[in-house]
């Protein structure tokens, strides 16, 4: 089934008063120390190096029990001689990031439960051990470089109110191929009987509406990225480069194309939690290795179809968020480098281009669903 026109109009959303990125020089900072425990078993020590208490959201971060991406893995850079008699003639093989085979979660920005939060006093630290072979194929063995950096959301009460930067050392390890191959994958594809499950009832209706809204949001965001306000694009992507604008627009168009049909495309979209990774804080999960998306219960109970609030979450931008993650929609898929407006707008241009929430925020910050017949322009930025 292909979707056509929306019953409602998508209009520019007024975000006239822009929140400023966090002044990360004045905020606490998290230092991550990575070490090898045994072959692919890694330990992370996360320390608050600032001078004040910090409460951060540990979903998609260290302490999360789900198989989320905590570090990036790279095959090490090396040099290949091209001629035995001319050592100066070499070919340099640059590091390549290994594909992540775990899950990525979108979590709510308000109403977070206590079990999603970690509090660290100045100088205090937490430890987390995890096996990188459970979420990446390391059966080839060899030299691997491990590191992580980005921004983690901080919370006041149960609401995300800012972000703090974190970074780690660069850890190089030698992986034993046989041991790595013996580690069970954290996520396995569903069997065929489960994959044929389909949406029905109110959830089917809600997802159909979300997909229609996603098509309109993504198409209009593509136009705005390609030829809209340069200052607005700069706000989110930290550049006005024509090549970057073209790339962003292409990803939005790919999302619109993917959302336009429920009978074809690169992703499989489930109305319910097929893997058991949902929680009261998570409206949706994505499995990038399999291009699978699944909605959680609070997608339907907590999120509106399309918000009227700038940079707030809703069903449409959550669906857009998940499609933006998927490498099958547009390769490479995006990562979770900065969550929420504060963190996303603190990223560099290259990071923003690879940050899933930057796309959702740009689409949400630019447009608004209105049931009015007359289209009114709300702002001219």
Curated annotation (Swiss-Prot):
Pfam families, alphabetized: Peptidase_M35
Cofactor: Zn(2+)
InterPro entries, per database record: Fungal_M35_metalloproteases, MetalloPept_cat_dom_sf, Peptidase_M35
Disulphide bridges: 199-271, 278-296
Cofactor note: Binds 1 zinc ion per subunit.
Enzyme class: hydrolase
Database matches in Gene3D superfamilies: 2.60.40.2970, Collagenase (Catalytic Domain)
Keyword Protease: yes
Recorded GO MF terms: metal ion binding; metalloendopeptidase activity
Function according to Swiss-Prot or TrEMBL: Secreted metalloproteinase that allows assimilation of proteinaceous substrates. Shows high activities on basic nuclear substrates such as histone and protamine.
Protein name: Neutral protease 2 homolog mep20
Organism: Aspergillus flavus
